[in-house]
């Protein structure tokens, strides 16, 4: 048995949810956390000093709904000089 994986790009995500809705959902997760209904693990941050870059990983889950997620964000500040975006990242959401 195989599970399917759905990959969405930025434009596809924007068609599904607005930034205003994202902010509302993030607030809701923190509200659930204050009630003990979600868990947000400590931020993992690593600075690549020799490469002038950094990486952040944020993750957590909502209890009782078998929904887990993470966001990984890389920052390459020198990309601006190359005409590239300084930030890139990925969000992953897992359910059962």
Label each residue range with its predicted role.
Residues 2-96:
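N-terminal ligand-binding/catalytic initiation module
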């Amino acid at each position: 048995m195989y599970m399917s994986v759905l990959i969405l790009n930025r434009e596809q995500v924007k068609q599904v949810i607005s930034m205003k809705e994202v902010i509302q959902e993030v607030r809701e997760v923190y509200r659930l956390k204050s009630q003990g209904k979600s868990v947000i693990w400590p931020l993992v941050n690593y600075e690549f000093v020799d490469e002038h870059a950094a990486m952040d990983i944020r993750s957590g889950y909502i209890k009782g709904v078998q929904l887990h997620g993470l966001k990984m964000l890389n920052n390459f500040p020198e990309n601006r000089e190359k005409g590239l975006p300084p930030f890139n990242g990925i969000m992953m959401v897992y359910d059962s």
